[in-house]
Amino acid sequence: MSVERTLILVKPDGVSRGLVGEVVGRLERKGLTLVALELRTLERSVAETHYGEHASKPFFGELVDFITSGPLVALVAEGPRAVEASRGLIGATDPVKAAPGSLRGDYALEIGQNLVHGSDSPESAKREIDLFFPGLS
């Protein structure tokens, strides 16, 4: 089975609540391997590029403000079906609809502050990894 990579962001709410270890632990226990990890406060230009698909939506400004409001942890995990596996661990975008046992289902209440971002496809993962970790490929 081929190995793929995915980008995971522990958003500022997850970092401030001390949930980085929980996120990393769940990824590792699932069998994914960390290949890059960085604590950083995101530059607005990077956030706008990352969330560019939402630029015309009314929540875009709030989304960018939130993701740049404090430190986040950006990481790259790899393994077979890494995107699908990590999305399952993260849970639905709306934490109220996220399954119990998922990160969002267990630890989040608000769509706007839902702890974690995970790439939604291998193609998105490549684009996002190139943005956050240039030259990693």
UniProtKB/Swiss-Prot annotation:
Active site annotation, chain numbering = 117
Q: Which GO terms describe its biological process?
A: CTP biosynthetic process; GTP biosynthetic process; UTP biosynthetic process
What reaction(s) does this enzyme catalyze? a 2'-deoxyribonucleoside 5'-diphosphate + ATP = a 2'-deoxyribonucleoside 5'-triphosphate + ADP; a ribonucleoside 5'-diphosphate + ATP = a ribonucleoside 5'-triphosphate + ADP
Q: Which family does it belong to?
A: Belongs to the NDK family.
Pfam families noted in UniProt: NDK (PF00334)
What this chain does, per the entry, is described as:
Major role in the synthesis of nucleoside triphosphates other than ATP. The ATP gamma phosphate is transferred to the NDP beta phosphate via a ping-pong mechanism, using a phosphorylated active-site intermediate.
**Keyword set, alphabetical order:** ATP-binding, Cytoplasm, Kinase, Magnesium, Metal-binding, Nucleotide metabolism, Nucleotide-binding, Phosphoprotein, Transferase
Record-linked InterPro entries: NDK-like_dom, NDK-like_dom_sf, Nucleoside_diP_kinase, Nucleoside_diP_kinase_AS
Q: How does it assemble?
A: Homotetramer.
Cytoplasm as a keyword of this entry, yes or no, is yes
Major location category of this protein: cytoplasm
- Where is it located? Cytoplasm
Lineage of the native species? Answer: Bacteria, Bacillati, Actinomycetota, Actinomycetes, Frankiales
Q: What SMART domains is this protein classified in?
A: NDK
Cofactor dependency: Mg(2+)
Task: Report residues binding ATP.
Answer: 11, 59, 87, 93, 104, 114
Record-given protein name: Nucleoside diphosphate kinase
A GO molecular function annotation here is: ATP binding
HAMAP family xref list? NDP_kinase
Gene name on record?
ndk
Identify the EC number(s). Answer: 2.7.4.6
Q: Which GO terms describe its cellular component?
A: cytoplasm
